[in-house]
């Protein structure tokens, strides 16, 4: 995931279920479950929700409260980052709310990564693909990688 300057503005409080996330000089609030944040009506906040596919599987029914909360994000100037390694397992009702989708791959030999920012669309074979809008090519930055433990298990939502 590539975060632009807008996401790093120091006055934006961050809510996350990633307990190991520590960013110097940032106000971070940790939560356990989606139910802990759906009543949050604060303006101009960042919500980072890891392993969203553990809470909402491909066949699950729509969570109307969470869906409504997501739809209100634009009006409340919220940035919501839903993280999953199983994009195809996220239900369609949740994919439809996404404004952008980021997908990252590592180049085979070099320690270089490519992240595509784009829109998820169904191709002719009914497979989800990303229509790239922007491409980021980068080498991982140890400073950023040290913000959280990428191996931290997220067991509840």
Segment roles from a protein language model:
Residues 1-2, 31-36, 65-68, 87-89:
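A generic local structural motif
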Residues 10, 24, 96-98:
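Short, structured coil segments at secondary-structure junctions
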Residues 15-43:
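Short glycine-rich substrate-engagement loop in P-loop NTPases that contacts/grips substrate
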Residues 48-50:
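Conserved proline-anchored active-site loop of SAM-dependent methyltransferases
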Residues 116-157:
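RecA-like P-loop NTPase motor core
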């Amino acid at each position: 995931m590539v975060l632009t300057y807008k996401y790093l503005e120091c006055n934006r409080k961050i809510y996350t279920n990633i307990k190991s996330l520590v960013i110097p000089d940032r106000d971070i609030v940790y939560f356990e479950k989606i139910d802990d944040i759906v009543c949050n009506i604060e303006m101009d906040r960042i919500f980072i929700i890891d392993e969203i596919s553990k809470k909402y599987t491909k066949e699950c029914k729509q969570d109307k409260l969470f869906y409504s909360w997501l739809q209100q994000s634009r009006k409340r100037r919220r940035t919501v980052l839903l993280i999953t390694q199983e994009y195809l397992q996220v239900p369609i009702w949740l994919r439809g709310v996404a404004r952008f989708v980021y997908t990252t791959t590592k180049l085979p030999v070099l320690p270089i990564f490519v992240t595509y920012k784009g829109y998820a669309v169904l191709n002719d074979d009914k497979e989800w693909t990303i229509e790239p809008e922007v491409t980021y090519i980068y080498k991982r930055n140890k400073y950023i990688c040290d913000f959280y433990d990428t191996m931290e298990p997220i067991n509840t939502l």
